[in-house]
């Protein structure tokens, strides 16, 4: 039994207003503390590329067209969401100190573009996060590699899926290897390359500021 029932009122908001609403809800949970963020593949990543290889197509749109939207949801999106949530749960159990671990997987904002989602998570990383853990094979994901660049730019500690320090040099190595392997199969790696360039620029800037 509920004392109040949700209404069917219609609201029209700007993007930044929706962001403020979402962050106000997150702040109710964090209450001035900072979280650990679990970065994991969702819309892109190794699972997607393996499916592209299997079905002999080059893009996500081609895969959806060939196999159908329902197939894509069942075989790519839903497994990625489950893996991301499982990863965040494993991080929380590993830490075992009550720290809130945030996963982006359950969050939906109808009408948002991919850049708007990325801007939202970038703000969360820069303002409400104290470290970022990356799931296995994160280097194949456009979103994860972007979040790695943000973490490095913000000076956040980064860890791999087992809790070992990741760091900029290892991240650059992993991202470069992923791009090379995907390039060899003819996939479009422009977004991965852009994120790698971001990290490399941060590395050069840091070395210039703190020469050995």
Please place each PLM-identified region on the residue numbering.
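Conserved catalytic or regulatory cores that recognize and/or transform ribose-phosphate-containing ligands
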Residues: 1-212
């Amino acid at each position: 039994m509920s004392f109040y029932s949700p209404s069917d009122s219609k609201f029209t908001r700007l993007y930044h207003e929706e962001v403020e609403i979402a962050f106000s809800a997150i702040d109710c949970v964090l209450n001035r503390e900072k979280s650990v963020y679990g970065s994991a593949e969702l819309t892109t990543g190794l699972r997607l590329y393996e499916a592209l290889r299997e079905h002999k197509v080059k893009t996500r749109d081609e895969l959806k067209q060939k196999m159908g939207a329902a197939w894509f949801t069942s075989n790519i999106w839903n497994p990625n969401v489950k893996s991301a949530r499982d990863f965040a749960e494993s991080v929380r159990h590993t830490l075992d100190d009550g720290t809130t671990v945030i996963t982006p997987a359950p969050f939906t904002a109808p009408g948002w573009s991919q850049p708007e989602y990325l801007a939202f998570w970038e703000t969360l990383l820069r303002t409400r996060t104290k470290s970022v853990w990356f799931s296995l094979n994160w280097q194949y994901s456009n979103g994860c590699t972007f979040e790695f660049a943000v973490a490095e730019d913000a000076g956040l500690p980064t860890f791999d899926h087992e809790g070992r320090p990741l760091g900029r040099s290892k991240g650059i190595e992993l991202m470069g290897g992923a791009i090379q392997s995907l390039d060899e199969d003819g996939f479009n790696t422009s977004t991965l390359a852009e994120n790698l360039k971001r990290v490399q620029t941060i590395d050069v800037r840091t070395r210039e500021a703190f020469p050995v």
